[in-house]
A protein has these predicted regions:
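Internal alpha-helical scaffold of NAD(P)-dependent oxidoreductase catalytic cores
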Residues: 1-58
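NAD(P)-dependent Rossmann-like dehydrogenase/reductase catalytic/cofactor-binding core
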Residues: 44-105
Length: 105
């Protein structure tokens, strides 16, 4: 743990960064668990992938650690994924995928 002396504006930015890094990530875990309901695959099957992803940002910038179909522009995989999702899930998948694409051009 590290102590930083910051201005109010910096603390506010740190807080919202924490929401993106932690709160929204936890929502993604919840959504992943929901997607695995009614399968014979437990959420724990994702834990090695989650741990590997988290470990990468200790040595790489988050942008450089980005992987997946949006990063690769793999339209076939993305379209198949969309076919497995509800309308609300599709909207979020598309929004996040587009953000990944924009940041990795």
């Amino acid at each position: 743990s590290h102590v930083y002396e910051t201005r109010q504006h910096d603390r506010e930015r740190l807080h919202v960064a924490g929401v993106f890094a932690c709160n929204f990530t936890n929502l993604m875990y919840t959504m992943a668990a929901d997607l695995l309901k009614n399968t014979h695959i437990p959420f724990s099957a994702l834990l090695p992938l989650i741990a590997e992803t988290a470990a990468k940002i200790h040595t790489l910038a988050p942008r450089d650690a980005q992987t997946g179909p949006a990063r690769r522009n793999d339209e076939n995989v993305m379209n198949h994924h969309l076919s497995l999702l509800t309308s609300d899930q599709q909207q979020l998948y598309k929004l996040l995928s587009e953000e990944i694409r924009k940041r990795n051009r």
